[in-house]
């Protein structure tokens, strides 16, 4: 049970260093803007931007997507961008610099005790990572922040602004104290993940392990409360960041993510029977997959439909067992770690896309499906209503009967599916653009730069 719990938490965490740089562009470039805008300077003046991301998986979760597309949009606006990232590293364009700060990544290993190396005795940070992971903790955000501070001390990079992507580490305090303007993005407070995991725990032992894993939240609360410039990707995430982290409401600006509408576009592909599609970025309670499985089993009583799952359920996990109990395994088609182009092809075969999450800070899967012209059934959890709007069907979280009714109704009404598909595509193209997101983000950069020397 212990190992399974650790694996689920790691997959769901929206959670002596060697340094190597690949294609670094910003750190070595001459500064083209000072720490505060001089009179008459343009807000469009190019900036040297440092994006921090402690984990940037390009295939799972939203943080790697955020880093990839925001860095691209910033460079297209004329700014220079370096991404400093721990493993897994992001997929970046060639004109975006990547500075690798690998940690020990002990939490990725099942045999944590066996990962001990004698070199840890000479490296206090590596020893901390190993001990924390060995005792059920998640050391990555804190350790990444320490390595970032060390990197800045060793290399003295010339950045105009540092933008943290949800590490919310103590290292941000240090960077601000040393004169670096800092902005941080909170996709959603991870307290939401902790609460969902605790609610689904089987016994007090598992709850104890969960609380140990999420100890890093104490650090993130402390850091967010002290930051004067915070971005959230939805109004819902803003409210929860204030409520759960105690953030100053006046310090937060909402900047919605964009969607790559050149990549995610309608493609009509042949299908043999009705197809329902969903993505599973992590097999954790927060994603609500069990409610979709129950709903799909209900729908199968009336419609010979197929469920397409992009992602995978943990072997022997709750969802894996539920598939067997419901007898729907022969109607489920799974795909894991596929290319974006392949994902768009799969959307082209789908009649309905479903996002059953209990909570999403934004809801990239909903936006991507809408961009592909696929009608969406989603819950009202978190930022999903802000993405879906009137272009889909919204139901309450944790309600498989409501999900089943909405799916069944759309599968039986082709005209409504077409209307919603067209409306969804139009909504995403018009309202969720990465260039717009980058421009709004740059406004916050300039505010941070202007106020850094004023004790903000």
Predicted features, each with a name:
Residues 113-136, 176-221:
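Acceptor-binding helix/loop patch of EC 2.4 sugar-transfer enzymes
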Residues 375-378:
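Short hydrophobic beta-strand element within catalytic cores of glycosyltransferases
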Residues 337-338, 345-350:
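Short alpha-helical donor nucleotide-sugar binding micro-motif in glycosyltransferases
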Residues 236, 258:
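Carbohydrate-associated surface elements
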Residues 320-341:
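Nucleotide-activated donor-binding/catalytic signature segment of Leloir-type glycosyltransferases, i.e.
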Residues 358:
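Aromatic "clamp/platform" in nucleotide-sugar-dependent glycosyltransferases that forms part
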Residues 393-400, 409-414:
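Conserved acidic donor-binding segment of nucleotide-sugar-dependent glycosyltransferases
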């Amino acid at each position: 049970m212990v190992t399974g719990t650790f694996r689920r938490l790691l997959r769901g965490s929206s959670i002596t260093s060697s340094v190597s740089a690949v294609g670094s562009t910003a750190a070595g470039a001459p500064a083209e803007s000072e720490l505060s805008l001089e009179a008459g300077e343009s807000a469009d003046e190019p900036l040297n931007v440092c994006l921090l991301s402690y984990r940037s998986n390009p295939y799972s979760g939203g943080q790697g997507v955020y880093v990839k597309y925001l860095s691209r949009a910033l460079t297209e606006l004329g700014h220079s961008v370096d991404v400093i990232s721990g493993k897994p590293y992001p997929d970046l364009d060639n004109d975006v610099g990547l500075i690798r700060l690998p940690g020990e990544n002990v939490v990725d290993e099942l045999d944590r005790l066996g990962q001990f190396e004698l070199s840890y005795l000479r490296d206090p940070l590596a020893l901390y990572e190993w001990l924390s992971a060995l005792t059920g903790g998640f050391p990555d955000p804190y350790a990444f922040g320490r390595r970032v501070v060390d990197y800045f001390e060793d290399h003295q990079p010339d950045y105009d602004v540092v933008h943290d992507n949800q590490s919310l580490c103590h290292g941000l305090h240090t960077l601000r104290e040393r004169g670096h303007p800092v902005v941080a993005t909170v996709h959603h407070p991870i307290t939401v993940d902790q609460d969902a995991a605790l609610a689904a725990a089987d016994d007090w032992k598992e709850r104890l392990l969960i609380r140990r894993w999420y100890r890093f939240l104490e650090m993130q609360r402390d850091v967010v409360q002290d930051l004067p410039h915070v971005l959230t990707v939805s109004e819902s995430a803003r409210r929860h960041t204030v409520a759960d982290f105690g953030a100053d409401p006046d310090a937060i600006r909402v900047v919605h993510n964009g969607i790559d509408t050149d990549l995610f576009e309608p493609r009509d592909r042949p299908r043999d029977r009705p197809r329902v599609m969903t993505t599973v970025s992590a097999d954790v309670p927060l994603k609500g997959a069990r409610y979709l499985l129950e709903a799909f089993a209900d729908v199968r009583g009336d419609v010979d439909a197929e469920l397409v799952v992009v992602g995978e359920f943990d072997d022997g996990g709750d969802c894996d067992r539920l598939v067997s109990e419901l007898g729907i395994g022969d109607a489920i088609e799974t795909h894991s770690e596929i290319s974006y182009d392949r994902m768009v092809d799969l959307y082209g075969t789908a009649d309905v896309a479903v996002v059953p999450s209990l909570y999403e800070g934004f809801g990239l899967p909903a936006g991507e499906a809408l961009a592909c012209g696929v009608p969406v059934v989603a819950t009202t959890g978190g930022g999903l209503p802000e993405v879906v709007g009137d272009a889909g069907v919204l139901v309450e979280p944790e309600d498989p009967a409501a999900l089943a009714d909405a799916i069944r109704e759309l599968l039986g009404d082709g005209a409504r599916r077409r209307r919603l598909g067209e409306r969804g595509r139009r909504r995403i193209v018009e309202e969720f653009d990465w260039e717009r997101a980058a421009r709004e983000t740059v406004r916050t950069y300039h505010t941070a730069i202007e106020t850094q020397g004023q004790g903000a």
